[in-house]
């Protein structure tokens, strides 16, 4: 695979990552849906992919960056797969994902705590085309991982 095609792929990854983060932030801040903790964690690989794509666009060593990008999206597949499993009731959360943070005894503290409750990771509050954002993230990350493995295998050093 030529360097020019790899460069185009990094542009696609940059665009996909930018769009994915933009949608997540739009859903949160414009539409008003508060994300669960796993939804927030799932943004991290896309932020890393943005940075890697920018570096790759200006750096000559694309193969190493492809490897890092592949590992990043593999982590995204695992994280989003875990989240989808929780949403579907297949997997029980390992850590508190329920938003049960009301340990306050005073009225003011209880009211303040109610405003800061994280949504339960099992609940799908927002979906696109009937598919949860965690499921869409899993699909996007899985496809990108497969493409990255293919490109890595056939890329020039």
Locate the predicted segments by residue.
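Interfacial segments of alpha-helical transmembrane regions
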Residues: 4-15, 55-77, 146, 150
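Membrane-embedded alpha-helical transmembrane segments of multi-pass integral membrane proteins
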Residues: 16-23, 49-52, 72-82, 140-147
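Immediate flanking context of iron-sulfur cluster ligation sites
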Residues: 17-34, 54, 87
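C-terminal TM-helix exit segments that contain a strictly Trp-centered aromatic cap at the helix terminus
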Residues: 23-28, 75-90, 107
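Non-cytosolic membrane-interface motifs at loop->transmembrane helix junctions
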Residues: 33-43, 95-98
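Membrane-interface loop-to-helix entry segments
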Residues: 38-48, 111, 129-143
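Extracytosolic (periplasmic/ER-lumenal) interhelical loops and adjacent juxtamembrane/interface segments
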Residues: 88-134
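Membrane-interface capping segments at transmembrane-helix boundaries
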Residues: 150-157
């Amino acid at each position: 695979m030529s360097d020019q095609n790899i460069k185009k792929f990094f542009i696609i990854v940059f665009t996909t990552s930018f769009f994915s983060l933009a949608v997540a932030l739009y859903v949160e801040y414009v539409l008003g849906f508060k994300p669960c903790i796993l939804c927030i964690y799932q943004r991290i690989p896309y932020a890393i992919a943005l940075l890697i794509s920018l570096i790759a666009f200006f750096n000559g060593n694309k193969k190493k960056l492809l490897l890092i990008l592949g590992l990043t999206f593999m982590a995204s597949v695992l994280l989003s797969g875990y989240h989808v499993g929780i949403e579907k009731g297949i997997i029980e959360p390992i850590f508190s994902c329920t938003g049960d943070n009301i340990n306050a005894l005073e009225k003011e503290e209880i009211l303040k705590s109610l405003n800061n409750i994280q949504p339960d990771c099992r609940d799908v509050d927002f979906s696109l085309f009937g598919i949860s954002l965690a499921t869409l993230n899993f699909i996007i990350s899985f496809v990108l991982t497969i493409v990255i493995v293919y490109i890595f295998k056939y890329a020039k050093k």
